[in-house]
Amino acid sequence: GNFAAATQSEVKRMLAYSSIGHAGYALIGLAAVTAGASANNATVMGAAMAHLLVYGFMNTGAFLFIAMVEHWGVGRTFEDYAGIGRKAPMASMAMAVFMFSLAGLPLFGGFFSKYVLFLGAINAGFWWLAAVGAVTSALSLYYYSRVVKALWLEEPTGNLDALDSKPTGLYAAVIVAGVITVLLLPGFGPVIETAEAAAAAVFA
């Protein structure tokens, strides 16, 4: 999924293919549990559940942003997103948070869920799975950062006057999703603990 995402020219298609990669991260947890590392079962499955939860907020927010851009009629490619940050700074800042968190950069929620997943895989003897996950996660930074680069660093290629009229519901939803994604960072400890408790109940 990550390799296909890296070749896309449309932002929505990139996100769709990257979803396959995130499903693969969760499967790393399943593989570790299947290996029979009972001492780590709850931790690894808890991390997988936490990653899916964090991913849900990040990805939902990103698709809401795309829906808003399509409402404006700007376009679908990375080039079409150029300069949007100047006309819609708050929503574009939220989109940057989604992209960096999806890429798993440190200090973002996506990093911690991946870290616990990869560590659990290593403890279960699947070091090669953790290595593959780390490499594909690094690759994802390339295509996620393309969105941020277009929004904030590139000159507009078309008329962005349509952005002066903001769809209130979509705009607010994007910003709220961005705030929740940021708040997941200090709240990640309780999130992972709750997920581990739920996983432990399954294996009890």
Q: For the regions a protein language model found, what residue spans apply to each?
A:
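Predominantly late transmembrane helices and immediately cytosolic-facing juxtamembrane segments
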Residues: G56-F65, V69, V74, W128-L163
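Transmembrane helix interruption/hinge and helix-loop junction motifs
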Residues: N123-W127, L185-G187
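Hydrophobic transmembrane alpha-helices and their helix-loop junctions in integral membrane proteins
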Residues: G1-G109, L119-I122, A138-S140
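Active-site proximal loops enriched in glycine and acidic residues that flank catalytic Cys/His/Asp
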Residues: S18-S19, L52-V54, G133, S145, ...
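Hydrophobic, aromatic-rich alpha-helical transmembrane segments
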Residues: V44-A48, L52, W127, A131, ...
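Re-entrant/interfacial helical elements at transmembrane boundaries that shape
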Residues: A16-S19, F111-G120, W152, P190-A197
